[in-house]
Amino acid sequence: MRLLLVPAVLASLLPLGYAAESSTVRCPSAKPKPLKFSKPTFIDKERAGGEPVSIVAQDGSIIVSAHAGTTHIYKDPQAAPGAYDFLRSYYNQTLNWRSTDGGKTWTYVGLAGAPEGPHSPTSTGFSDPDLTMDAGGNLYNVEIDLANVAVFGSPDDGQSWPTANPIAASGDRPWVTGAEENEVFLYVNLPKQLWRSTDGGLTFSLVSTSFPADSKLLVDPLNPKKGLLGPLGSGGVAISPDDGQTWKDYPAPLGDSTQFFGAIAADRRGWVYAANAGGYSGSSDVEPNGEVTFNYFNRQTKRWAKAPIRIPTPKGDALWPWIIAGDDGRVAVTWYQTHAGKEDKFYAYVAYTTNGHGSTVRCSDGSKRFVPPQFQVANASGRPIHAGKICLSGTTCNANPSFEGGDRRLGDFFTVNFDHKGNLFVVSGDTTLKNALGGPKPVANPIFIKQTAGDKMLVKPDKTRKTRCLFPLPTC
């Protein structure tokens, strides 16, 4: 597949005018400002934090949820002294935190807002969290026991999670998508199912068991009352105009990828974006052949760009892409990156663009010229978030006779998002903390990394409202 190399584009597109300078014509640059991030901070140093997800509530607070660690436990005997991180908050439920100061401090969320304990009275499931919000500001999360799929909700901006359907479905790797007020869709990966609730997640009706979307669905910005967008496993988008009843799929030209789940984003104008990150093939991989590729989908022509754009990366390997979009053309991609010669050290990288579907600039001679998406790339974590191997075999990692080769503490993915001001942030697992005896911990801990410089995902901040009262208090 032909790749569009971003650095090479500068030369090859001089006639098209990307920041071009010649004796006669000058064209403005479309490249965003350099991107910088804070040092990683731990959301919690004493609780598990693999596969973290996030949502920004309508009051501006940030909610993070993570895997409880049951199927992520590191089997190295030296990790046993760190078992407290797994045991202290194990209630056969996922773990949840909330920040009201932009991620500076975090509060663990238990029953009725308590700082300890289980989060819901009836929901059960130690793994596979996912967060979403409906148009009314109600939050939803999901968790599984490798059999039941439980959906639980928060009517108070993530301060508590009092409502739940403990058996909304059955299967592995669910995702939730909030739509109209009290409407939430539940996607289950295996066996494939799509469910819909119109009563705030209390009951669900089956929509389909045969559709092309693979992984987390999005509400279609161009059809917010009925439309859904879903990623294709091989790269691309599936579009439904009727609440998931019918779909049309559009495969995307993309490079190799090491990922369990397809990932797409849609900006507020309706443009769709996809990214792949690949090269890392597992615990025995020492070849630095990684790549990160990006593409964009035009809703009017119903076509992807003919060639994917290769985002600049250091020589090494890449895996587990995630993508988010804000205002028109503003897109960010995150992935884990290794550096050549240091194959066992993994960093969290982020790339972003403010002209994600290309842009037209006016040059000094008055001509208009097209500029393809331009990216800035940052080593967001600045330090390794994991040293060692990463197992790519899902729950079967536990059967690996080598504890290092079966290391699954990070889970299967991590995510990027932005706050109500448009600042990017990454939530990831981190395995660098030591137990009391100096050995590794049996689970990862959750970290938060926030943008400190660069353009924002929003031209103007989203409006926020007053925080709702802790459920079920009528006033506060």
Task: Name the predicted role of every residue range.
Residues 22-476:
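Extracellular, repeat-based ectodomains that mediate carbohydrate processing or recognition
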Residues 1-20:
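Secretory targeting and sorting signals
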